[in-house]
């Protein structure tokens, strides 16, 4: 049995953390023993809700990671962010090291201390998983990485798990639009509120669910009051199970400045909800224009597309039919896990 230590440097629970948990819960338990290793804080409820075994780090540094490695004795360390990858590289003589880059972050596209240190450690990685082609190609030191070391692997989710969780929530919801994500950079939540305000001028009784929390929550609340949108927006904060709310919405909106493959968009596809988003890297290949939703960097056009979907049942049915077909290959967890297993072997 192979022992896999999933190493994460933060105590939050967002996209990269969600991917790690998906991998842990979908690996063959007879062949793999997996543990989630990170500082424990905001992520605790999410991990326990998903029955994920974890090793708590009092602080994310070399000495605490060394203790965890000594205790668990992993065959593979799967590091899910830059900081975790750099620390993991120090144990390359003891374990196979997999570095997983989950986003096309702006600070990876230029010379910084982080990109420099990552460049120094890439020789210690057995494999680097990039969430998209442009995440790989945009990395400042990309040309220094050996050709066979990198693999592009788009995120996926288990549609069955999402729908099962949606059915566990017995509350009734009814929303036109849902935003599911952190209220912080690079999600651009203030832009979200501005777009909702534009939509309200055309679709007066619009109801929007905002699920998520973050450092920008207070300024988001101020913007909502300033624009008089209190009757149109419900702020749910973080939810352990947001999937009934998602399934009960007609459209998902994303306003991110950059993304990898956003998990919330995959969750929307699993729930048969069209996606309208800014033209971020990870969605360009998934949300083909007019097939599963719409992409634009113009606020007016984003608002216009959402209102068009809300006002046209025929359009909603057309998108729904397309999404149902696409879900089978976009959210193919079996294929994803097979690739991960090959990387571990």
Regions found by a protein language model. Name each.
Residues 274-277:
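Short hydrophobic beta-strand element within catalytic cores of glycosyltransferases
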Residues 14-22, 175, 179-201, 208-210, ...:
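A conserved mid-protein helix/loop that constitutes part of the nucleotide-sugar donor-binding site
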Residues 238, 257:
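Aromatic "clamp/platform" in nucleotide-sugar-dependent glycosyltransferases that forms part
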Residues 15, 314-344:
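A charged, aromatic-enriched C-terminal amphipathic alpha-helix characteristic of glycosyltransferases
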Residues 289-300, 308-313:
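Conserved acidic donor-binding segment of nucleotide-sugar-dependent glycosyltransferases
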Residues 79-85, 101:
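Short His-centered aromatic/hydrophobic patch
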Residues 140-141, 149-174:
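Acidic anion/phosphate-binding donor-loop and adjacent secondary structure
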Residues 6-61:
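N-terminal strand-loop element at the rim of the active site
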